[in-house]
């Protein structure tokens, strides 16, 4: 489906003036030569919504989607778009509970950039040291891979943090370290992606419930514990959820 089952609605009509999603889609198609599928385009347009002051509406984007859906390709496009087109050279941080996952996504982005002569010409350096992989552009833009842990990303101010496999985070250590890195930068976003988690996925469960409560708790995650007048107090306007999932109680083959 192009549209997720559960999602944070936009504050106003989305146009080229109120979302940078179209810019990112055009970068994918006209520069990288990648044709995005409808759900990827829909998500970029909605998740890159702008506030009236021109900053991103969402500081945190939670993406729930099945494996093999094209999630990694979209994240790579997003990362390169910001690296090459942001006015201020950004720092992109890629992280995951398993470093191999973050390095695999980073490697794909490097290959994308190298495959386009105009982009390849802007590459200053590609660091391949174990645990310190980085793509550096002439402009000063960086895309670094960090292990998700207490030290992951600390001391770095990330403009875009790509946090994959959120379901694997069973403690708050890594999330706290990474989320902390973006607070110092205006225009920064954390994109946290995952497929469905289980009871041990504490970070995913909390972020999902917080976002759902702001939407009136459509799946009953709070178990009726939140009074309607409390929903506004608990809502976090800077948290967006985009969830492609089956409704509770639906058959597995829906």
Where are these regions (language model features)?
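Phosphate/NTP-binding elements of NTP-utilizing enzymes
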Residues: 1-254
């Amino acid at each position: 489906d192009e549209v997720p089952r559960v999602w944070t609605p936009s504050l106003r009509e989305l146009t080229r003036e109120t979302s940078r999603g179209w810019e990112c889609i055009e970068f994918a198609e006209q520069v990288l030569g990648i044709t995005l599928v409808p759900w990827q385009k829909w998500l970029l347009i909605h998740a890159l919504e702008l506030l009236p002051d021109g900053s991103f509406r969402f500081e945190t984007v939670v993406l729930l989607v099945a494996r093999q859906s094209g999630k990694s390709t979209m994240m790579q496009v997003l990362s390169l778009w910001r690296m090459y087109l942001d006015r201020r050279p950004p720092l992109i941080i890629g992280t995951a509970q398993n470093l191999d996952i973050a390095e695999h996504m980073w490697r794909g982005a490097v290959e994308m950039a190298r495959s386009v002569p105009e982009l390849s010409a802007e590459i200053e350096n590609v660091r391949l040291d174990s645990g310190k992989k980085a793509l550096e552009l002439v402009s000063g833009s960086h895309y670094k891979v960090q292990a998700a842990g207490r030290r992951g990303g600390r001391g770095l101010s990330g403009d875009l943090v790509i946090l994959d496999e959120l379901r694997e985070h069973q403690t708050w250590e890594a999330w706290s370290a990474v989320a902390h890195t973006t607070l110092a930068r205006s225009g920064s976003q954390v994109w946290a992606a995952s497929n469905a988690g289980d009871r041990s996925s504490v970070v995913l469960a909390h972020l999902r419930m917080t976002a759902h409560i702001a939407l009136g708790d459509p799946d009953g995650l709070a178990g009726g514990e939140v009074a309607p007048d409390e929903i506004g107090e608990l809502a976090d306007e800077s948290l967006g959820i985009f969830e492609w999932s089956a409704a509770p109680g639906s058959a597995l083959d829906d």
